[in-house]
Amino acid sequence: WHFSKTEIEHLTQAIIAFTIALAFMSVGGIFGALEFPTAFILGGIFWIIPLAPAFTVHEIAHKIVARNYGCWAEFRASPAGLRFGIILAAIFGFFIMAPGAVMVAGNTTRSQFGKIALAGPVSNILLWGVGLGMVALGLETTNFTYGGHGLLFFW
């Protein structure tokens, strides 16, 4: 487990950009943010709670599998992708974002590279299963909701 200073900075930038875009989405864009600044700020705070762990686990899953195959692997943010997502969310109230990718260097087979690529989405499916299990057990109850849904609804 080694995370360079650069990788930590890039993960942080991506999480912040995602949070800003989701905050814009929660109020319908820049005009909603200007009209309801408190809702914009609370939307950002609300979204960072499920987003940060889900995004981080997704990216680290790629890294762990790559490292398991003896590869160097680190997340690198895409500044253009992050800006595009924020601008899209600010203007239209929805977004598509290409936050970056885990860069992998080393000799891998096609099968190994496929497993590295699948590790992130599989980690999100597993997190969804954990969240679904918690909801099924009634553990989603929280006084902190957004749109009538607790945090696990979004995780």
Spans of model-derived segments:
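Hydrophobic transmembrane alpha-helices and their immediate loop junctions
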Residues: W1-W155
